[in-house]
Amino acid sequence: MSIFPKKLIKGKDDFTTFHMRICNNSDEDIIGQIKYKVILPDGNSIEMDIDRTEKVDANSELNEYDNFYIKAEYTIGRYFVEGRFIWDGMDILSDTNKDDFFDVITKEGE
């Protein structure tokens, strides 16, 4: 997964976008759900269940984009994001699917 933009200015920027790329190298279609876990700077976390079913055709790739909105009560700091694709009760993304992060800052240049 990847995130853009990586830096958000609190009070100016409203959201960042998570990009999830899922490759299906098997000969069968898979159907599952994307889930995100956002770990806040204070150590608490938010579970984002997108609540939609994704179908990845056999021997193909799926690219999905989801927005994460920055609420007024969110603090300045680094937010870590774990992206998962759940199929048949299992997380099927490989170790190469790296978690990512973004920063909420007070002003440009921080």
PLM segments and residue spans:
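Primarily secretory-pathway and cell-envelope proteins
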Residues: 1-56, 60, 66, 80-86, ...
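Short, surface-exposed loop/turn segments at beta-strand-coil junctions that are enriched for proline
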Residues: 69-75
